[in-house]
Amino acid sequence: MINTHNGVKEKGIKRIDIDDYPAIKAHLDSFYQQLEKRQDKGDTPYNLRNCAYIEDFSKQKIVYPNMTKFMPFLLDKKNFMTNQKCFIMTGEKLAYLTAFFNSNIFKICYRDNFPDLQGGTRELSKIFFEQVKIPDVEDSIDIDFDILVDDVQKGNDNISLKLEKVLILALELEQYEEYILNYDINLK
């Protein structure tokens, strides 16, 4: 990915000077006419438009798609960039939030907050997330979620059930445990 950002003037972050990268400039020069016509260019045709949140890509964050059937949320601890339209969340208790958003509890309670598009796909835009009320947990519990979410993201499927049970306990939903654990999103 070529990130020739325009900098963040308010924070003193300078724009990328394409002349510092002659091989990339030579490649982009073959598209110069198209670059020059762009409405969303930065200070030069080589630079992207201003992005006030560019530093958020270098933070731990939750990454999730704009539209999806399965509502997957990934905790990114390695500062990845995406090449598709995705959303990101930064802030506190990201491991807990990742666990919560991937849980049956979230799907049962909030799936209908997100518009149903064709074929059962849901739109996960920010405006719909703003309507979601997320139960808070103690900071000490977030550490447990951090370990469990890491294991799930490494492909340890056995941990998914444990993670769901930890959420049930943390949110005091034991009386609904059987329903939550047996919930099948495909039947809805």
What residue ranges belong to the model's regions?
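Non-catalytic DNA-recognition/assembly elements of restriction-modification systems
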Residues: 23, 31, 136-188
